[in-house]
């Protein structure tokens, strides 16, 4: 059913984006592959989420989980994690990696909108990291994430700001100069300003708690969290 809905365009997914990530799926867990940046920022993302939401014992949903890098680390922190994605190959890789790691994650092929209709107000924590800039309708994604969170639950989004600096760093720098990412990974027109994401979230019934920037130092090759939200940023909300 889901495959037919994807094909006929009734699901909030960009088929070109889906195929792009499917082609790279076998490399998700290679820390020196195209997914190296995700491996490097994962401890920062995990620490930030855990600091706010205290993951141990919580029911957590990871939206757009891909190969499961964040999902598994949240499971290792003591959470009961469900990961959803629409990429068949990414989900297969995620499930296979569980056999190696021994972690427990419930992976499902589902859109966030479909799961919100099935399990409203079900999760203590909802994460949607590095996904909003890849979907045709981010407003729909934000609304569904809000619907999935329990009252008082936490919802986290990370994405890329839209301004000349983010174009220079996230597109030109990351994809063409430093070769951190494959060319064509990002579409500048899909980048989202923090003010825009904040408005989407407020309209979905979420209350903003914090926005924090995530920066890359090309000299030290180290990522860090700080006040600079000009390029990558994370926003934390309560339902």
From Swiss-Prot:
SUPFAM superfamilies in alphabetical order: S-adenosyl-L-methionine-dependent methyltransferases
One GO BP: methylation
Binding-site residues, S-adenosyl-L-methionine: 45, 64, 85, 129
First-level EC class: transferase
Reaction(s) this enzyme catalyzes, per UniProt: a 3-demethylubiquinol + S-adenosyl-L-methionine = a ubiquinol + S-adenosyl-L-homocysteine + H(+); a 3-(all-trans-polyprenyl)benzene-1,2-diol + S-adenosyl-L-methionine = a 2-methoxy-6-(all-trans-polyprenyl)phenol + S-adenosyl-L-homocysteine + H(+)
NCBIfam families: UbiG
Protein family according to the UniProt entry: Belongs to the methyltransferase superfamily. UbiG/COQ3 family.
Name the UniProt record assigns to this protein: Ubiquinone biosynthesis O-methyltransferase
């Amino acid at each position: 059913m889901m495959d037919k809905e994807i094909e006929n365009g009734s699901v909030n997914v960009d088929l070109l984006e889906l195929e792009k990530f499917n082609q790279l799926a076998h490399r998700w867990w290679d820390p020196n592959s195209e997914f190296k940046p995700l491996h490097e920022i994962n401890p920062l993302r995990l620490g930030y989420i855990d600091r706010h939401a205290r993951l141990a014992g919580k029911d957590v949903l990871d939206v757009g989980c891909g190969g499961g890098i964040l999902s598994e680390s949240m499971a290792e922190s003591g959470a009961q994690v469900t990961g959803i994605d629409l990429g068949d190959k990414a989900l297969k890789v995620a499930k296979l990696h569980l056999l190696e790691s021994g972690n427990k994650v419930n992976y499902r092929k589902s859109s966030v909108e479909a799961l919100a209709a099935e399990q409203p107000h079900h999760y203590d924590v909802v994460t949607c990291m590095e996904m909003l800039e890849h979907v045709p309708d981010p407003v729909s994604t934000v609304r569904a994430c809000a619907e999935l969170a329990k009252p008082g639950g936490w919802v986290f989004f990370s994405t890329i700001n839209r301004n000349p600096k983010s174009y220079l760093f996230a597109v030109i720098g990351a994809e063409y100069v430093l070769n951190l990412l494959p060319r064509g990974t990002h579409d500048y027109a899909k980048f989202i300003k923090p003010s825009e994401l904040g408005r989407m979230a407020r309209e979905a019934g979420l209350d903003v708690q914090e926005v924090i920037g995530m920066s890359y130092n090309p000299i030290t090759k180290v990522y860090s969290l700080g006040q600079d939200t000009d390029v990558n940023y994370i926003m934390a909300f309560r339902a």
